[in-house]
């Protein structure tokens, strides 16, 4: 068998971007044949990606694209398993590339995005290779695209864990940026009350009625109290009803009216929102591994 030298490992790593140890193992398995070692790595990296696919991806970042004229924008949520990988340059680069593809190619859904070309291969092939290189599952969760009616501002906060796009008609660039920051801070669910689901409103109403009843309020007053509670709730969760973060004496709606502007739409992404994260009990995991090892003896 040919001796596996450091220069051979370095050459294979430069060709494949695979981890050093994986390159050395592949060269050993291939008997020092570089071409065969590349094939071994392709198989192994593919297998690693398949094994990783079952693991929960609740960490990650948002990637954004904004055209120079502010008329076209896109945002992608790219997920991984750990915050460590979310800071990886290749991972960050992929998020940005995907946002650019969404803006310029306008795919219908994640499946269509995965079939687009990126660096001479499909997005899915690129993702699979990166999973193999990094050793963690990576998933494209969602994306949004805006063709502006006015001008789009983008804002990314908290290590790219929160991303905002807002399409402002009228006003100016600074107002658009301020609104994007407001959305990141106040996290509205919709532009106005019409965007809040009736199911959520009725749920808040029922809760308000029961709370008022438990507090001993007269039955005749329950509906009126509940209506007041619902209206307060709607102001809290709608962009137009919220107090503006830079001047809480006025609502966003009042601010826009004073500036002769309106919000055509906005998108808010919070990474991992709604994904159930796996909480690992380290002591229990070690005990489980020890028990499994003992059972093999």
Swiss-Prot record:
Cellular component aspect of the GO annotation: cytoplasm
Assigned keywords, A-Z: Cytoplasm, Elongation factor, Protein biosynthesis
Chain residue ranges for the region called Involved in Mg(2+) ion dislocation from EF-Tu: 82-85
Database matches in Gene3D superfamilies: 1.10.286.20, DNA helicase RuvA subunit, C-terminal domain, Elongation factor Ts, dimerisation domain
InterPro entries: EF-Ts_dimer_sf, Transl_elong_EFTs/EF1B, Transl_elong_EFTs/EF1B_dimer, Transl_elong_Ts_CS, UBA-like_sf
A molecular function GO annotation: translation elongation factor activity
Intracellular or extracellular location(s): Cytoplasm
PROSITE patterns given in the database record: EF_TS_2 (PS01127)
CDD domains linked: UBA_EF-Ts (cd14275)
Annotated family: Belongs to the EF-Ts family.
Function of the molecule: Associates with the EF-Tu.GDP complex and induces the exchange of GDP to GTP. It remains bound to the aminoacyl-tRNA.EF-Tu.GTP complex up to the GTP hydrolysis stage on the ribosome.
Protein name: Elongation factor Ts
Organism: Azoarcus sp. (strain BH72)
Gene encoding the protein: tsf
